[in-house]
C-alpha cells in the first residue's frame, strides 16, 4: 500500500522514467555484486515484473543466486525505495502473451540482440535489428527472452529533505503481516 501511494505521488508530480529500477544481483563466479537499470513493466498484487534476455549476464546471476536488491529513486518526490526479494522467471505462457502484445520494433530488438555480448561495431547491432524487422514473424516469443518477477519481503522508504533529517521507514514481512520500523537518518 505504501509503495502504491509513493508511486501515485511520483506520477502526479510527472516523474520521468518512473519505470526505471536498479536491480542488483550477485555473481558467484566473479564474487561481485552487479547492478543495472531495467524497465519495470508491471506491478500486480505486490509482484514486480520486468523482461530480459535469458542468456544475459544478469539472468545467469539470477540462476546462481536468486536473492536481489532493487532500488528506485524518484527525484520529483525526493524518494528512494529499497527492496529485497527473491527473483524467478515468469511462465512461458505469460511471456508469450506479453510478447505478442508488444510493438514489432521492440520485438525485433529482443530477437536480434545478444544482450551484453561483445561486438565489433554498433553497425552490426543496426544490421541485425533491420534483418529481424525484415524477416517478420515478430509476434512469436523466442525461448531466450522472457520475464522475471519478484515479490518483496522488505521495503525501505527514504524521504529526503534539505535539513538532511531524512525520514526512513522499513517494512519487513513477518509470516502474513508487515512489521514496521522507523530508521535513523
Where are these regions (language model features)?
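Binding-site signature for planar aromatic cofactors or substrates
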Residues: 1-185
